[in-house]
Amino acid sequence: MTHHVTLTLPFLLAGALLASSDAAPGMNRFAAAAYRQLAQNLAPDKGNLILSPFSISTALSMLLNGARGQTAAGITAAIEQHAGPGYHAAVAALAAELTKQANGGGNQLAIANGLWVQQGLPLQSEFEQTMRTLYAAPLTPIDFQAVEQARQTINAWTAQHTNDRIQDLFARGSIDAGTRLVLTSAIYFYGKWHSPFDPQNTRVEPFQLGGGGTAEVKFMHQKADFLYGETPAAQILEMKYQGTPVAFDILLPKTNDGLAELERSIKPEVLSAWFGGLASRKVEAAIPKFRAESAFSLKDMLSRMGMADAFERTADFSGIDGRRDLFVGEVAHKAFVEVSEEGTEAAAATGIAMHALAMRREERTVFRADHPFAFFIRDTTSGAILFEGRLAQPAS
């Protein structure tokens, strides 16, 4: 008899802080690939898109810890990593450095991992030790036969570790008596802008919706020095959080309907070139206040990215319990992001080269984000992406 494993990925976007690590380049490759995959299935006229590639990668890395053979190879391919002997330690080091840099100065970053195991299910000692020591995910015995109680227990843990921003991650019916193990990875971040927006300058203005029409939205206004750049198809604005190397980058298409084309060009080397070409400018910025969330299954996306074997009953997760009787039933994702005058809260080729802006410093530069755009929250030291997404409907 085979049983299934469920991965839960409760994300709370809000700002982000990252540090350099051997795991970061692979996470960025995964971040770009995941964005393109999800964007292909959710066009800008269909709504917002929010994900945390860091959280997804972390949860899948925990799963990789117990995978063997072709199943392990598929997960490794999906997360775009070269998972050598020191890989899990590198992921742990990245999380530790993030937490160290993020907290303080009014900012808060919390990363929490959980391992929920059916009572009486014996685990391999090496798997359990790696989960406990590197991923800080202690084993919690739970009775999945008591389905509703198990669901509520894990949902309560998720809410607790996301400042109550992620509620009811598991809907009724998503956990059943066949569940044997649940992996959870939760992130909460609150970051204050280095240069806050004055609420007195916030006013209601029209935003061009992805599906056509407009919505009346509160826009924050500020004229200040920002890192700014342009590509032939987009403007790029970077807003920093105080006391950290983390920034919020907006990729704003130059046309109202240009986001889909821009999203197709998102690749690690493209983003690196764009962000690396930014320069300080005095910019008149108009940014919408918004609060949005995404909730969807990642199962189909991850299958397309190479790990279909993990979802089959023939999967090899013998590194978890010593037997080949486990497979992944679902990978659930839920994300939240809120941007306001004070900061951010969240529980994320061609035309690579930047071109020089032919302008004098005193010339007027306007950045008006009044139509669908993409955003990234990343560490500017390593370039690692913690959160990414698309805003197409600010009122959603």
Range-by-range predicted roles:
Residues K46, H82-N256, E261, W274-R364:
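Non-catalytic, conformational "gating/processing" segments within enzyme and secreted inhibitor domains
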Residues G213, S382-A384:
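Residue-level signal for well-ordered, solvent-exposed loop/turn and beta-edge residues enriched
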